[in-house]
Amino acid sequence: MSGPTWLPPKQPEPARAPQGRAIPRGTPGPPPAHGAALQPHPRVNFCPLPSEQCYQAPGGPEDRGPAWVGSHGVLQHTQGLPADRGGLRPGSLDAEIDLLSSTLAELNGGRGHASRRPDRQAYEPPPPPAYRTGSLKPNPASPLPASPYGGPTPASYTTASTPAGPAFPVQVKVAQPVRGCGPPRRGASQASGPLPGPHFPLPGRGEVWGPGYRSQREPGPGAKEEAAGVSGPAGRGRGGEHGPQVPLSQPPEDELDRLTKKLVHDMNHPPSGEYFGQCGGCGEDVVGDGAGVVALDRVFHVGCFVCSTCRAQLRGQHFYAVERRAYCEGCYVATLEKCATCSQPILDRILRAMGKAYHPGCFTCVVCHRGLDGIPFTVDATSQIHCIEDFHRKFAPRCSVCGGAIMPEPGQEETVRIVALDRSFHIGCYKCEECGLLLSSEGECQGCYPLDGHILCKACSAWRIQELSATVTTDC
């Protein structure tokens, strides 16, 4: 890259004059106060920068100085010389491309670059943006309103007569190449704050920018061509993206096959008012009067309602339902339990006792033949069933006095008896054999004093002992 070359100073000034800001207004005016007059100098060609690009106005050799493009694409001149507004012809394609490139580079440029001196600028120009040659339209440069501050201000390039001193700083913005972001709209007014960041349009909803930098929402010559590459609301943008998805209709062959099957099914199964439902045996429809049988809360064909064992038809016959299965009477009886007393099948209630099944009328006492349904009973050693009374009468111990069976008292379940001399006695039969005194097994006075196999009280037992002693003495 090449920088600006300057002529050696001819008239150096010993004094330094303050430099002011050069305001390019585009109108001729007095030369800036630098303490020395401007000297003619040869034409200087500046290297193109991302934010400031120099153009040679086509006005002829009488052009006063190098022109440069400031922020927002307005052609300006340095050294306070008037800007040639008509120098950039609307029909010039190259000038329009450079103007758009500089605007894109400056407004999309990176932020935070430090200000550099104009004599130390060395940058590579960014690649020109993609454009369409067929849709370029001349855009007249809008005049920049004067503002007290804001934006990059061009430096006053001094000639040989300018004293050597600190040059006015020039703010240079370098554009950073950003992929996927569209340039902002032209015509934005210059503000004092920092430039806005790059605009990233949302895919499918953002603005599509064409070579003329027109939005789809703005009516213009290039809007129609750009909108052709964007589908409707349901579609996506360009670049190999998806379009609106249209549901595919069913092939005619499949539709015809489906209609044919439906027609055949309707012909084989015509709707009828005599339809009763599906058969519980075969699962087919029961249609027609007299063709079905209702049983077990279901509908059966006449030929399907048969016995589950012998397969005999049960229409008009008695049948037995066991676990939702139908049985004829013979097959049902064969499956029943037999009574342990009469050996007949039990068709009604079953009375179970000691692991056997009985008819309620067959479960009786073997002595009195009374039914024992709900009555306590007992069995003997041969598994004969007895009621409690008959069992005690038959198997209870006998009293040695009266000879009767010793049985429990009414309302009692236990039998109370007195055993003495290996004999059993009722409580009321346990008396002294001499005087008839009621003996007791607990009292000492009324206790039993047996003598020679007799039950005697204490007094009677003593009298008998004395009597026997006297007899023995007399015999001696």
From Swiss-Prot:
Protein's name according to its UniProt entry: Thyroid receptor-interacting protein 6
Organism annotation: Homo sapiens (Human)
Pfam families: LIM
Variant or mutagenesis effect after changing S102A: Exclusively located in nucleus
Positions of post-translational Phosphotyrosine modification: Y55
GO terms under biological process: chordate embryonic development; focal adhesion assembly; positive regulation of cell migration; positive regulation of non-canonical NF-kappaB signal transduction; signal transduction
Location relative to the cell: Cytoplasm, Cytoskeleton; Cell junction, Focal adhesion; Nucleus; Cytoplasm
Composition-biased stretches (Pro residues): 1-12
Subunit composition and interactions: Specifically interacts with the ligand binding domain of the thyroid receptor (TR) in the presence of thyroid hormone. Interacts (via the third LIM domain and C-terminus) with PTPN13 (via the second PDZ domain). Interacts (via the second LIM domain or via the third LIM domain plus C-terminus) with PDLIM4 (via PDZ domain). Found in a complex with PTPN13 and PDLIM4. Interacts with SVIL isoform 2. Interacts with LPAR2 but not other LPA receptors. Interacts with PRKAA2. Interacts with MAGI1. Interacts with SCRIB. In case of infection, interacts with S.typhimurium protein sseI.
Keywords: Cell adhesion, Cell junction, Cytoplasm, Cytoskeleton, LIM domain, Metal-binding, Methylation, Nucleus, Phosphoprotein, Repeat, Transcription, Transcription regulation, Zinc
